[in-house]
């Protein structure tokens, strides 16, 4: 098995969240890239989170840190400039793609397309982190709020996969980020995923 794995290229299509550009990550972007080089990766896609289109769309830690949407948009633009620079700096050691991870909420498609037109990413990672305005992967408390807003666990799963389907249809991203992220804080996720109204949406999205 080891000999087989040694002949397989190491790649990453959804990596590179850094403490420099993401409030819930660590290390600088250059340190992240150096770690990929040291680990022997052939190529990597750096995919920081896109900036929120308004203060209401921020992550809880961004709100708690008093990081406004305007500041986060400026930081996101700085990320692109920094990543493009590192792309050139390490071009002889690692093939780097400068991309970003989308957010999905009402009105986000137009904003994503605006960012694509301005920054011209190498590709997109399409993700859903918010359902009914609640962040579903931050902590258990925020997840419970999302369940309450949806009315039930089953309804939350359905809304998540419906939002994901809309994102897939509208943006056609090259990569789907953590397809089943909705299960992160659901101890009974296998049972929930198996519910007919949920599973039919999973199959549709796949």
Regions found by a protein language model. Give the residues of each.
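An N-terminally biased module of ancient metal coordination in phosphate/nucleic-acid-related enzymes
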Residues: 1-106, 111, 183-200
């Amino acid at each position: 098995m080891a000999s087989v794995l040694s002949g397989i290229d190491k790649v990453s299509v959804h990596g590179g969240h850094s403490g420099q550009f993401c409030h819930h990550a660590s290390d600088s972007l250059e340190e992240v890239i150096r770690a990929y080089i040291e680990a022997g990766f052939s190529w990597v896609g750096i995919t920081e989170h896109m900036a929120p289109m308004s203060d209401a769309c921020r992550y809880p830690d961004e709100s708690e840190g008093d990081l406004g949407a305007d500041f986060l948009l400026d930081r996101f633009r700085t990320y692109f400039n920094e990543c493009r620079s590192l792309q050139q700096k390490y071009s002889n050691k690692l093939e780097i793609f400068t991309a970003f991870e989308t957010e999905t909420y009402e009105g986000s498609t137009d904003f994503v397309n605006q960012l694509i037109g301005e920054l011209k990413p190498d590709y997109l990672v399409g993700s859903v982190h918010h359902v009914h305005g609640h962040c579903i992967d931050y902590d258990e408390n925020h997840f419970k709020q999302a369940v309450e807003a949806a009315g039930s666990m089953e309804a939350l799963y359905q809304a998540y996969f419906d939002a994901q389907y809309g994102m897939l249809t509208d943006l056609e991203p090259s990569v789907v980020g953590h397809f089943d992220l909705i299960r992160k804080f659901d101890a009974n996720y296998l049972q929930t995923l198996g519910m007919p109204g949920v599973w039919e949406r999973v199959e549709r999205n796949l």
